[in-house]
Amino acid sequence: MDYLDLGPYSSASGTVRLPGSKSISNRVLLLAALAEGETTITNLLDSDDTRVMLDALGKLGVKLARDGDTCVVTGTRGAFTAKTADLFLGNAGTAVRPLTAALAVNGGDYRVHGVPRMHERPIGDLVDGLRQIGAQIDYELNEGYPPLRIKPATISVDAPIRVRGDVSSQFLTALLMTLPLVKAKDGRTVVEVDGELISKPYIDITIRLMARFGVTVERDGWQRFVVPAGVRYRSPGRIMVEGDASSASYFLAAGALGGGPLRVEGVGRASIQGDVGFANALMQMGANVTMGDDWIDVRGIGHDHGKLEPIDMDFNLIPDAAMTIAVAALFANGTSTLRNIASWRVKETDRIAAMATELRKVGAIVEEGPDYLVVTPPAKLTPNAAIDTYDDHRMAMCFSLVSLGGVPVRINDPKCVGKTFPDYFDRFAALAKA
């Protein structure tokens, strides 16, 4: 097995420029592909998840010209030209969910599949929503999960569409992005959400990006959304992808744990991503955080000089960045509780189980619940722990922070960070100091 040994490190400081946001990159690629006109996307993330989206769009007949982190997309005016395609989408939820919806109304015959873990990640709530407007979608193996066969269908909207919001916000995102392509009798489509909508900031990203492409979604709280029907996305001409706020969390935590000062560039006050809220969680734990429009500075205590404060917080709004808090809790002076994180169970791996298992390897006492995690740090971290990463990029990046506790740590299968941040460990090593 491939592995990477890190540390021991005693401090972390410097400046890091973030790669483009995965969530924004894949949304913008699909919107640009469906739009009228040519869109130049800058600071586009280059990672496994964006590559599978680009590959799929190419197979669907979208004209793409890539040069470094810039991509010029020639829009299809709402309909992909390829009416048959076999699309492999890896483990990219940000690709498989929105593309499934767009393909369901495109009038073609498509197969959508991915890696084995993708075939364990639920998609049934989205399929149920699409079937309400006439979509013809079959499950190849297990009911409610990919692989999917999508067939030509007569699509019509004559009643509000209902979709569950308590498993993944990507189901609602997929519907919102696709419904402008579908005609409705009164020129609009209503989507009603069943249950508590999780990850609300990601829906906000979707709505803001749709507006950049000329389509305005109205919402009544987080339970009812009104989408213009039978309209066309229009290219904004040029759009820049802001830095990835989830990826920022590892460096911000490094600054807090390793003393700093550490500056992250590419996200800040002006960010449309909810995960910038991670900075507030760090502040609650005692880190010193300042923020500009597109940068965040953090100074911490350094493990030799003190401890972070424990935290007890609802992380429903920022579940991805919350993983970083679970590891930062190793450096607190008491027990921390992460609440309302049930969505971790259906991510790249069962992140609650995985996080509990790996935190115990470095000496923590962990209580694992259906939607919560309680972490009591050890008096001293266990050196040379071999951390399994479960083909989950965030597990690998989170546990790099253990090395700032003055102990070496081994990260198994470090290449899994390629999903969102291929050169993460090089960037981390440039900031961490022995």
UniProtKB/Swiss-Prot annotation:
NCBIfam families: aroA
Location of the active site: D320 (proton acceptor)
Pfam families on file: EPSP_synthase
Protein name stated in the entry: 3-phosphoshikimate 1-carboxyvinyltransferase
Subcellular location: Cytoplasm
Species annotation: Burkholderia cenocepacia (strain ATCC BAA-245 / DSM 16553 / LMG 16656 / NCTC 13227 / J2315 / CF5610) (Burkholderia cepacia (strain J2315))
Single annotated GO MF: 3-phosphoshikimate 1-carboxyvinyltransferase activity
Keywords: Amino-acid biosynthesis, Aromatic amino acid biosynthesis, Cytoplasm, Transferase
